[in-house]
Every structure is written in C-alpha cells, then in structure tokens.
C-alpha cells in the first residue's frame, strides 16, 4: 500500500560549458522528483528533467497528481494504470494548463515513473526484468492510448507484442552483451575546438563508435569547422550526429543542412521548432538521404503520431522524463514499431531509466539496436549510476528503475 507521497526539487549546476547548446547556454541540470513510500519500506523514485528554473512548479503539480495514488496498492494500481494515468491527465483544472504538455505533463511523468519504480522494487526486480515478465495484455493495461486510435488501438498494440513474443529468445542475448552507447558530450556548444579534439580522442579511447556535436551558431562556418574536426578525428567508420537544438528557421535549416553533406551525419537533430511538423516534413524531403532525429521536446504521443504520419522522422527521440513517463514512452515505442521508425531516446535521465526501456523495446517489440545516449555529468549524484564500459551500457541488476538520487 502506498502510504506517503512527497517531492524533491534537485538542481545541479554543471558549469564549464557542459550541457550547453545553441538555445540553452548555461543549463542547470535538475529534477522534479516524486517519492512514493509503501508500507513495506520501499520507496519509488520518479524523475522529470528540467534545466533549473521552474522545477518547483513541476514539483507542486506532481504533489497534486501523487495524491491520486496514495492509499492504493501498487499491484492493483498498475494492473490498470492506463486508466489511472488518463484520469490524472484529464483532471479538469490542471488539464487546462496543458493539455498533455508543459509543467503538468512533466509532473505526470515524475509520478508515473515513481509508480513504475515502486512496482519493480516491490517485486525485487530491475525494471527491464519486470517489463519482460509482464504479459502483453498486462503491458497494454498500463498504457493510455487515447487519441491514437486512428493508428494504434489496444488490439493492434497487443498484436505487436504477441507477434514478437515467440522470437524474444533470439534477442535476449543483448542482456549479456549490453546495449551500445554514444557519447553526446564530445562537442557541447560552448566547447572550444581544442577541447572538442581532446574529447573525440577520449571518446574513441573509451570505445564509443558514435558521437554528437552541438551546432546552431550565428556563424554556420563555425559549425562546419567543428563538424569537420569531429569527422577528421573520428574517421569514416564512426557515426557522427549533428544537433541544432531548434535554433534554425526552416529556410536556414534547408541551407545549413546542405553544408553538412560531406560530413555524412548519421542524423541531424532538432533542426527547428518542435511543434512545426510541416517544417520538418519540408526539410526532411529537401535534404535526403540525410535523416532527421526529433523528439527531445515533443511532449506527448499525439504529436509523435503526427510526425510519424508525416513521414519526416528518421529517428524518434522520445524521452520518458518529458512525456508522461514510462507508460507513454511505451505507447510511443509501439506506435513507432507500427511505422517502422527506430526509437533512440533522448536521456534527460542521463540514461538511468532508459537503459531499462531500450532493452524492453528490442526484446519485446523487435526494435533495432542502434545506441543509447550517454551523458556523464550527473553520475556521482545517483545511488546506482549507469555502468558504461567500452562504449556499452551494462545491464543493471539492482531492483527498480535506477533513478534513486543521493
């Protein structure tokens, strides 16, 4: 039985140019944390990611949503969690502040993730193992698929999971080998050229075979120079991603993306405003065969549906600490599977939670193994930080979702 709910506003200034991009020049990596304590001594910890200011607003909303799950048994709650999540999301007064976006959506993510963490801990299982032990019907019961019915209803979601159940054993070897990562910290926006060179060498030495560079400068030639540095040092066999963090207008994006053709980027990420599906479609068609990656700032399954329907995303970067937590992440992953688009999450959680989810996506849904973003800057603050060696995420074994903070 869940006995108490509380929140924490945790902020971690990281400085030294770490985490900087074209829009967010001086981020303070922060979490709105929901803590759910049960009568057996377990504490579920749920995260929503912010950049500092406003975290207290998310905590206030999370406290409100968490009141809906207090005095409820975690097994009974999660047996029909999709309905409970919809009930919370549709609370009429807070819904007006969204719907399904902004502060209220982040708050719902925090509470939802705490529920999943508590469920896994109460069973003594790491989250990935809990997910894999649930039947397809139990998984679907945790999802709110409203507004997806034109593309993905409950019968179709169940069919995707059932269709891949018989071949799961062929994909379970990933649990032993680990999930490949990519280094997103090679080229933060405020880093100088020499620091980028040094970081590239370190990433290659650490076993990474993919890395990312932040672009979006007022002078595109700076971006091209930095990208050329990464490609020259990394060589042609390493995947290099370019991330503009929404900095460009559509006309700018069309022109600047062409400049990167010789760099051969694996993707170009967040080129323009995340709500502008049509702009992404025009851009995607104009820069082929280069591909777009998007989703870091997409707040809900409906907008992801629109992007998939528009056929403009080469990779979907849904983040379980921005959408409504694990449940909506799984709904979006099922939707992506239907459309044949790979999920490569953004990791506002620093990979702590998503290391579990990508294992489930591959084993239970047959999503391809590409890689998972790795950001090291908050490692010392987690009780069980991710274990990445030779560029690979080792499979976590501790009960829960790996989201406990010190």
Region spans (language model):
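Metal-dependent enolase-superfamily TIM-barrel catalytic cores that perform enediolate-based chemistry
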Residues: 145-282
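Predominant activation on well-ordered alpha-helical scaffold segments within soluble catalytic domains
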Residues: 59-66, 112, 116-117, 128, ...
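Flexible, glycine/charged-enriched surface loops at secondary-structure junctions
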Residues: 77, 127-130, 214, 267-271, ...
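Shared catalytic-loop signature of beta/alpha-barrel
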Residues: 258, 264, 273-404
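Conserved, mostly hydrophobic/aromatic
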Residues: 2, 41, 65, 111, ...
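Metal- or metallocofactor-binding catalytic centers and their adjacent structured scaffolds
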Residues: 37-145, 149
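Structured beta-strand/loop patches that form or line metal/cofactor-binding pockets in enzymes
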Residues: 1-53, 379-381
